[in-house]
Amino acid sequence: MLQYQIDRIEHQVSDDRSQTGIFLIGPLERGQATTLGNSLRRVLMGGLEGSAVTAVRISGVNHEYATVPGVREDVLDILLNCKELTVNSRSQELEIGRLVVTGPAEVKARDLQFSSQVQIVDVDRPIATVHSGHSLELELHVERGVGYRPVDRRNEATTAIDLLQIDAVFMPVKKVNFTIDETAVSEGGSTRERLRMEIVTDGSITPDDAVAEAANQLIELFQPLATVTMVEEVPQEPEPTAEAQIPLEELNLSVRAYNCLKRAQVNSVSDLMGFSYEDLLEIKNFGSKSADEVIEALERIGISIPQSRTSA
C-alpha cells in the first residue's frame, strides 16, 4: 500500500478572523482520493464539535419582536448579530457572558465579559448601537455542540420568559472543497492521484486542527471493523400457530385412537405435527384405520403431515 503524506501549502487569516488552509495529500492509488475527500468533507462539515450562542437575555425585553428604548437596532437585529458571533468555549458546561453599556456607544463583541473558558474570535463584530442617555444590558448563553440545533418550541413553556432562544450553528468549518490531480506518475509508469483540499473555518479552530480531528473521528469509526467477530446465528423456533395449540380432545377422535395417542404422550396438535404417517403406524395398537382418522382430523383444521420420515 502506498505511503502518502499531507502538506499544508497555504494558510490565510481573513479580516473576519476566518481561516483558510490548502492541503495536498498524496500519492494515492486510483480511487483513494475520492474516498478520502468525501469522507473528510462529510466529517468536517457536520461532525466536528463547535461553540455557539444559544440564547440571549436583554433587560426589559420578553419577546423577539420588541424594541429597546434608545437602541438603533430592534431585538431581531440584535439576536442576529449575536447568532453570527464566533466563539470558542473550552467548557462542556453552559457559559454566560454579560455586558452593560451606557450610550452613546457602538457595542461590539469585545464588550462582552466571559469567563476564561470562552474566547471571542471576532471581537470587532457589532452587536448594537446605544444612543446618548440610554443603556443596554445583555446576557449571552454559549454552549458546545455538533451540527445545527433549532429552537425547541416545546421547551419554551419551561424557559424563562425573558430568555430568547436562538437557532444554534455549532459547525466550525464553513466550507470544504477538494479536487483530484491525476498527473503525478510513479517510476513504474502507473498513474497516481493527489488530493487537493481547501478548508475554511470560522476561526474558532485552525484548518490543521480541523483535519486532524476529522481524521481521528474516521479512525474511531473504522477501527472496530479491523476485528470482525463471528457470531453464530441461533435459529429461532417458529411461534406455534393457534391450530397447533389445540388439545387432542378437540379433534373428536375415536376412543381407541385417543387412548393410543395419549399413551404415546401426544397431548395436542403440536405434538402430532412431529409425526409422519409411518410414525403413527408404529404407535402400539395404532392401525391404519386410526392413522387415517388422525389425518382426516388434522386436514379439517388445515394441517397435513408427511407420509414418511424421509419426506418430513
Swiss-Prot record:
<dbReference type="GO" id="GO:0046983">
    <property type="term" value="F:protein dimerization activity"/>
</dbReference>
<feature type="region of interest" description="Alpha C-terminal domain (alpha-CTD)">
    <location>
        <begin position="246"/>
        <end position="312"/>
    </location>
</feature>
<keyword id="KW-0804">Transcription</keyword>
<comment type="subunit">
    <text>In cyanobacteria the RNAP catalytic core is composed of 2 alpha, 1 beta, 1 beta', 1 gamma and 1 omega subunit. When a sigma factor is associated with the core the holoenzyme is formed, which can initiate transcription.</text>
</comment>
<dbReference type="GO" id="GO:0006351">
    <property type="term" value="P:DNA-templated transcription"/>
</dbReference>
<dbReference type="InterPro" id="IPR036643">
    <property type="entry name" value="RNApol_insert_sf"/>
</dbReference>
<dbReference type="GO" id="GO:0000428">
    <property type="term" value="C:DNA-directed RNA polymerase complex"/>
</dbReference>
<dbReference type="GO" id="GO:0003899">
    <property type="term" value="F:DNA-directed RNA polymerase activity"/>
</dbReference>
<feature type="region of interest" description="Alpha N-terminal domain (alpha-NTD)">
    <location>
        <begin position="1"/>
        <end position="229"/>
    </location>
</feature>
<keyword id="KW-0548">Nucleotidyltransferase</keyword>
<dbReference type="GO" id="GO:0003677">
    <property type="term" value="F:DNA binding"/>
</dbReference>
<protein>
    <recommendedName>
        <fullName>DNA-directed RNA polymerase subunit alpha</fullName>
        <ecNumber>2.7.7.6</ecNumber>
    </recommendedName>
</protein>
<dbReference type="GO" id="GO:0005737">
    <property type="term" value="C:cytoplasm"/>
</dbReference>
<dbReference type="InterPro" id="IPR036603">
    <property type="entry name" value="RBP11-like"/>
</dbReference>
<dbReference type="InterPro" id="IPR011262">
    <property type="entry name" value="DNA-dir_RNA_pol_insert"/>
</dbReference>
<dbReference type="InterPro" id="IPR011260">
    <property type="entry name" value="RNAP_asu_C"/>
</dbReference>
<dbReference type="Pfam" id="PF01000">
    <property type="entry name" value="RNA_pol_A_bac"/>
</dbReference>
<keyword id="KW-0808">Transferase</keyword>
<comment type="function">
    <text>DNA-dependent RNA polymerase catalyzes the transcription of DNA into RNA using the four ribonucleoside triphosphates as substrates.</text>
</comment>
<dbReference type="InterPro" id="IPR011773">
    <property type="entry name" value="DNA-dir_RpoA"/>
</dbReference>
<dbReference type="Pfam" id="PF01193">
    <property type="entry name" value="RNA_pol_L"/>
</dbReference>
<comment type="similarity">
    <text>Belongs to the RNA polymerase alpha chain family.</text>
</comment>
<dbReference type="InterPro" id="IPR011263">
    <property type="entry name" value="DNA-dir_RNA_pol_RpoA/D/Rpb3"/>
</dbReference>
<dbReference type="Pfam" id="PF03118">
    <property type="entry name" value="RNA_pol_A_CTD"/>
</dbReference>
<keyword id="KW-0240">DNA-directed RNA polymerase</keyword>
